[in-house]
Amino acid sequence: MFSIFYASFQQDAKLFLFFPILCALFRAVFIKVYCPYPSLRGRWPVVFHCFRYGFWWGMDFNAYVFLIPFVLISLPGAFIPAYAALGDTLRLAGGLVYSLVLYLAFAGKMIFYSHFHDIYNQIVKLGGHAEKHNLADIFFHQNHGALILLGILPFELACAAGIRFFLSLSSLPYPEIAGAVPRYAFNTAVFLGCIAAFYWFRYGGTFWHDNKPEWDTIPSLVKKDIFFAKATVDDLPALEQVMKHDLNEAYSHTDAEDLAAIAPLKTDPRPLEDLPNPAYAFRRTAKGARITKPKHIFLFVGETYLEQFFDPQFACLNLVSGGKQFRNDPHTAAVTSALSAGIISRPSIVSLMSGIFDAGLELNEKESFWQNRLPTALPRQLAKLGYHSTYWYGGNVTYGNFNQFAPACGFDEVRTATDFCGPDAPRTWVGVYDNVFLEKAAAMILQDNDARGPYQFHFLYTTSYHGPFKIPLARYGYDPEKVMPDAPEDIRKDRTRQKNLGTFWFSDQALGKFLRTMKEAYPDSLFIVTGDHAYDMSAVLSHTSLLPRECNLRERHSPVLFFNHPEIDQSILAGNTIGGHMNIAPTVFELIAPEGFEYYSLNPSLLEPIDHVVSPYHWLTREAYGTYDDDFYQPLGEGYGPEALKEGPQPFTGERAGYMDLTGYLVRHPELLRAEEAH
């Protein structure tokens, strides 16, 4: 009986050997495809420890390739010889199922990295409300989905051959042991040794669960290189980390915990308990208008309109000539580093509208927020100054329920381009082409100007710079040889890169034309231009002569942010070079509101000096740009190159917690969302 078990568990061990090799091959492919360096020369110690540590971390799942057949095949097979005879067939079948799981997880990671330049993270959960047919469109048209699916069969055949090879390796014969007691002792030692071996591998070469591999214990040599640190993590452990951590801990907080975090941040001296809800704790008083009250205010949010392309290093690409016409205007005030309120589109738009951070809670999807009376909401507060507010979206506002959420924030009109541009308007899966959308929106603003009253606020949000990049750019005047004649040839002549970069140019041109049209029609207008978020352009520009490195933190995360009005210049920003989405509303009120006007804002205006900006995801000072994902940050300023990276404790964690807990508290108390302060 035990001789059958002895032979069988060795087959389990042979099956187990195949999968760390498969995971290492996947890791090698990932590094080959996405490595930002032209050569690995001088980095081989990093590569070695990346694979070494990744091997042990992968045992979080791979160790079960030994345990499961051990329990389901070898143990019962020891008592049922006929069942044991089927063992290798069952192992092959189970191994192919696990191989398919690894293949799909790896393919998903490769796609995810191409879009977000990161391994699986919480964005996976933020996509829960994404339009499924749109995801399918991207999968098949941008990410070679058909090839991925067709690749399953040859991949499985190759895995079957590999598994059969390992299962065919010679086994150790059961030793001849004289005497029953020594034989039972040997058998017991083998059985216990199998269990011990499982735990030793499962815990990453240790018998202590607390010492098993995790992100914090990646060798520092590897962790300092962000790319190889990410390459260390196998796909299933990465997905496990996403799934085992809730998107937001807000639901598990107590009221006392949240109020204690909010209290240090409030600007109103009254106790939180005396206010209709904690959002009222952020009352501020305007010091007096700095400009003539504009009849039109335009908040323009460009899809992924990032600061990076305004940097001198990337001037040769000439992708932002439309925006630069305003950015370089002497009556423009701009910051050079900014924070978006969210890491993807909807949380940023929600935060800009509502005046509180979405914090990953998808407020626009919650019915309780479709009837909110938040005092911090930008259009609601502008109404107190006599402004009629309109939200213009280049897509369909019903996606994400913004047809419900935007009016609740105080918008008098919510206009959706998929309706007012007509059914035949050219569009991507996200929305109508920016040029068509903005031309039609401009015409409607001009046509209905009198009907909207003397003071108007227009919030416009575009969509076209979004994959898959299928806009026929040549039809709209894009020729890389004419647009970017000074760009390096490996960018200018690369068709794949040009689909991406050309779409950015296309969106910028539409933006510039709209701004010019509105400024000609309404020269006293106040314009605020920003992006919903930035984007890691490493996937597009790395491996080129222009960018022989990965994009740094600032380049990955900083959207554009500037203000334009005939009565301002750069000096209006009090020397500030940093800012964020949540500084926009208070800056507007301090520019236009009369002295004594009360408004509500989490953050101060940019008309007074600020030394830091915080969001749920990032922190920013004049000296550094960091995230709350890890302890690394990018030092800014003279003396530091674009690749500089430092490690240190995360600052402003209390402030971050307070902002997030404010949102969490309001989510848990929907009955407070309609509460208003008595006057």
Regions found by a protein language model. Name each.
Residues 244, 248-287:
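Short coil-to-helix leader/linker segments, especially the first N-terminal amphipathic alpha-helix
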Residues 2-250:
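Transmembrane and membrane-interface helices of multi-pass
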Residues 39-46, 114-127, 138-147, 236, ...:
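General structural signal for secondary-structure boundaries
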Residues 269-679:
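Solvent-exposed soluble domains appended to multi-pass membrane proteins
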Residues 5, 47, 51, 135-139, ...:
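Generic structural signal of hydrophobic/aromatic residues within well-ordered alpha-helices
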